Regions:
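Long amphipathic alpha-helical coiled-coil rod/stalk domains
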Residues: 126, 130-133, 137, 141, ...
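An amphipathic alpha-helical core segment
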Residues: 139-172
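Short, Lys/Arg-enriched N-terminal segments with co-localized hydrophobic residues
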Residues: 1-11
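Leu/Val/Ala/Ile-rich N-terminal alpha-helices, chiefly Sec-type signal peptides and the beginnings
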Residues: 11-70
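Long amphipathic alpha-helical segments with strong coiled-coil/leucine-zipper propensity
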Residues: 49-145
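Alpha-helical oligomerization segments
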Residues: 166-208
Length: 208
C-alpha cells in the first residue's frame, strides 16, 4: 500500500515490516534480560561459595539460599554448586582431606530434602575413603620407585668416582629419568581416579 504524503510516496508495507522487526527485537531483549538475571545470580552463587571456602560459615550459605525462591534460587544454587564441586580435586596432602569435609558441609546445605542430605553425606564419606586410598597409593608408588632407583644411583656414583676420581652423591630428585617415570606413573593414577571423581560428582548433582 502506497500513501502519497506531500511530494513523496510512503510504502506502508515497509513501515509494517520495520514495526515487525522492532517487535522481534523487543522479544529478544526480554530473553536477554532473563539471561542477564541468570548470570547475575549464578555469579552471586559462585561468590558465596568462594566466601564459604574461606570462612567455613555454612549457616550463612543456608540463610542466603532461603532468601531466594524460584528461578533465582535455582540460578544461585547452580553457581554455588559449580564452584564447590570444582574444588573437589584429587588431594596431594592430608590438608586437602579437611577441605573435602568443608565442601561437604556446603553441598549439604543445597540438598533437595532430608533423604538427599543423607545420601550426600554418604557419598562425601566415600570420597574421603577413596582420597585416603589415593594418597596411600601415591606414597607407596614413590617409595617403590625410590627403592628401584637407589641401586642405579649407586652404580652411577661409582662410575663418576672412577671417571673423575672424586666421590659424588646423587639423589633421585636430581635424576631427570626418575622424575619422568614418576610423573608418568602419577598421570596414569590420576586418570584412573579422575573417572571415579567425575562419576561421584554426577551423583552429587542429582541430590542438589
Amino acid at each position: 500500500m502506497l500513501v502519497i504524503y506531500g511530494a513523496g510516496v510512503i510504502d506502508m508495507s515497509k513501515i509494517r515490516s520495520a514495526l515487525e522487526v522492532a517487535l522481534e527485537r523487543s522479544a529478544d531483549v526480554k530473553v536477554d534480560r532473563k539471561a542477564v538475571s541468570e548470570e547475575k545470580f549464578v555469579r552471586r552463587g559462585k561468590t558465596s561459595a568462594g566466601r564459604f571456602l574461606s570462612d567455613g560459615d555454612d549457616d550463612a550459605v543456608g540463610r542466603e539460599i532461603k532468601t531466594l525462591s524460584g528461578e533465582e534460587r535455582g540460578w544461585f544454587k547452580k553457581g554455588l554448586s559449580a564452584n564447590l564441586l570444582a574444588n573437589i580435586i584429587l588431594p596431594r596432602s592430608e590438608e586437602d582431606l579437611e577441605r573435602l569435609d568443608l565442601i561437604g558441609r556446603g553441598l549439604k546445605r543445597m540438598a533437595k530434602d532430608a533423604g538427599a542430605a543423607r545420601n550426600l553425606e554418604y557419598l562425601m564419606n566415600r570420597y574421603g575413603e577413596v582420597f585416603r586410598q589415593y594418597l596411600d597409593t601415591i606414597r607407596n608408588l614413590e617409595s617403590q620407585l625410590r627403592a628401584q632407583w637407589d641401586g642405579r644411583l649407586r652404580q652411577k656414583e661409582e662410575q663418576l668416582r672412577q671417571q673423575i676420581g672424586q666421590t659424588v652423591s646423587l639423589t633421585v630428585e636430581q635424576d631427570p629419568e626418575f622424575r619422568k617415570v614418576l610423573s608418568e606413573k602419577l598421570a596414569e593414577l590420576d586418570s584412573q581416579y579422575s573417572e571415579i571423581l567425575d562419576r561421584g560428582k554426577a551423583e552429587l548433582r542429582k541430590l542438589l
